[in-house]
Amino acid sequence: MEPLILTAAITGAETTRADQPNLPITPEEQAKEAKACFEAGARVIHLHIREDDGRPSQRLDRFQEAISAIREVVPEIIIQISTGGAVGESFDKRLAPLALKPEMATLNAGTLNFGDDIFINHPADIIRLAEAFKQYNVVPEVEVYESGMVDAVARLIKKGIITQNPLHIQFVLGVPGGMSGKPKNLMYMMEHLKEEIPTATWAVAGIGRWHIPTSLIAMVTGGHIRCGFEDNIFYHKGVIAESNAQLVARLARIAKEIGRPLATPEQAREILALNK
């Protein structure tokens, strides 16, 4: 089984300080949190940005400020920017940060109900985004929220629109309106991915109460794991986590106890095909 890659989604676009008082918002706070997460075992930072008042943002100069701040304190970590933005963000603003040419960024594979909103990813926009990844030479992580999106991604590969190989898939399970994080759902998604895109690597982000069940399954079946305040603000039920690093450290400890090594930065880049 290959080494485990832990990703820390430290801020997100929907979580607020009212939900999680320890949420990092400014570039300086994000850099401090990224360093702590790296030291706890994370090798990827999934990055959304905020304005100082907490509003979600896709401003290029703000992204660059956050990226530079993180690079200054932890140059080894992989920074994966979000092209999802906040629900309702214009597609042009979502796409724009690819011009910064990060190592990695997210590509959402379809539309779904997202709580009380609709997270719109029109097929034409998905194709446009996939072409932008190639234009800027950015490695995609494809975000999949239900099984039909695996089929949609497989079709894009067959058409030559997505060419990254191996392709990294992130199962995002437990979003209200999407597939839940029940173990049988994750097991099915794993099998379905193997059938449709056999060379793909995968990770899981279990939202809220599904964080631990999905993480444990991934840990023992060869998948990788995302954690952090974007997905889950609690350490235990009803107990607010002290930091993103606390969530990373728990997964790192469990991995050590079951004998699955954590990936080094070099191994993570190799697994995610960032060196190709």
Swiss-Prot record:
Impact after mutating S82G: Reduced catalytic efficiency
Root EC class: transferase
Stored SUPFAM superfamilies: Radical SAM enzymes
GO molecular-function terms, A-Z: 3-keto-5-aminohexanoate cleavage activity; metal ion binding
Entry keyword Transferase: yes
Cofactor: Zn(2+)
Pathway: Amino-acid degradation; L-lysine degradation via acetate pathway
Transferase in keyword set: yes
Highest taxon listed in the record's lineage: Bacteria
Catalytic activity: (5S)-5-amino-3-oxohexanoate + acetyl-CoA = (3S)-3-aminobutanoyl-CoA + acetoacetate
Membrane-traversing stretches: none
GO biological process: L-lysine catabolic process to acetate
Gene3D superfamilies according to UniProt: Aldolase class I
Residue positions binding (5S)-5-amino-3-oxohexanoate: E14, S82, G85, T106, N108
Chain sites annotated for binding Zn(2+): H46, H48, E230
Keywords: Metal-binding, Transferase, Zinc
Known EC number: 2.3.1.247
Pfam families according to UniProt: BKACE (PF05853)
Function: Involved in the anaerobic fermentation of lysine. Catalyzes the reversible reaction between 3-keto-5-aminohexanoate (KAH) and acetyl-CoA to form 3-aminobutyryl-CoA and acetoacetate. The reaction involves the deprotonation of KAH, the nucleophilic addition onto acetyl-CoA and the intramolecular transfer of the CoA moiety.
Subunit structure: Homotetramer.
Recorded family membership: Belongs to the BKACE family. Kce subfamily.
Protein name, entry field: 3-keto-5-aminohexanoate cleavage enzyme
The organism's taxonomic lineage, starting at the top: Bacteria, Pseudomonadati, Candidatus Cloacimonadota, Candidatus Cloacimonadia, Candidatus Cloacimonadales
